[in-house]
């Protein structure tokens, strides 16, 4: 009787231990699943935010480039530049061409160009305006079919393409340097909660992002923080 009671007690203890181990194992597996799922979601969110940030930076830079390029094509620059360009063109390609300016620039500078390009104008160079042009100029060869675009919009697009590629390259390098990249609202609670959870380290890119976003007016009064998982 005593032996049976001891065996029953051992069986109960063994069953309880196995059940406890099963519960612990299941809890560990569930925790790992949740962690893996959370990291995957965070990584996807970080990629989405990074792409959004890249678009925002690119749009801001394009706006700046367009504004600065248009301002650079002032009357003084055109007064000096266009006679040189037209003279060089005539020597290399012939004197049958159209010089197209914005209506405002043509009104302002027509007298200047008529004096500076008198010989070329008498030989076949024509001046005209195009309402679609806001700054800069275009040269249209006599045979037509194509034109050489030195308008502010075309030059700005050229610079913007280069800048867009450089922004993408820089952010791509940054993204590859850490497995989690995220712009977060910056406050004490955010920092505290991150330090209590998975180990995070502040990125040195924070200053650049916060400064640029603030100056570009993309986030108003918010400050943003770039974080990467520690050891990444």
UniProtKB/Swiss-Prot annotation:
Belongs to the V-ATPase E subunit family. SUPFAM superfamilies: V-type ATPase subunit E-like. One of its GO terms (biological process) is proton transmembrane transport. The keyword Ion transport applies. The keyword NAD does not apply. Produces ATP from ADP in the presence of a proton gradient across the membrane. This is V-type ATP synthase subunit E. It comes from the Bacteria. Keywords: ATP synthesis, Hydrogen ion transport, Ion transport, Transport.
């Amino acid at each position: 009787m005593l032996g049976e009671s001891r065996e029953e007690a051992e069986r109960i203890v063994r069953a309880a231990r196995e059940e406890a181990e099963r519960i612990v194992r299941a809890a560990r597996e569930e925790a790992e699943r949740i962690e893996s799922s959370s990291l995957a979601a965070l990584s996807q969110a970080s990629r989405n935010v990074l792409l959004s940030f890249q678009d925002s930076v690119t749009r801001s830079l394009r706006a700046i480039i367009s504004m600065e390029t248009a301002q650079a094509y002032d009357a003084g620059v055109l007064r000096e530049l266009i006679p040189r360009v037209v003279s060089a063109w005539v020597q290399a390609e012939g004197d049958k061409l159209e010089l197209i300016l914005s209506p405002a620039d043509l009104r302002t500078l027509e007298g200047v160009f008529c004096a500076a390009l008198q010989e070329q104008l008498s030989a076949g160079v024509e001046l005209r305006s195009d309402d679609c042009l806001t700054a800069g100029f275009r040269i249209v060869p006599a045979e037509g079919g194509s034109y050489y675009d030195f308008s502010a919009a075309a030059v700005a697009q050229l610079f913007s393409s280069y800048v867009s590629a450089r922004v993408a390259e820089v952010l791509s390098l940054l993204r590859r340097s850490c497995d989690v990249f995220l712009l977060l609202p910056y406050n004490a609670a955010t920092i505290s909660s991150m330090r209590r959870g998975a180990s995070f380290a502040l990125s040195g890119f924070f200053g650049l992002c916060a400064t640029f976003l603030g100056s570009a007016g993309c986030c108003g009064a918010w400050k943003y923080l770039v974080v990467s998982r520690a050891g990444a």
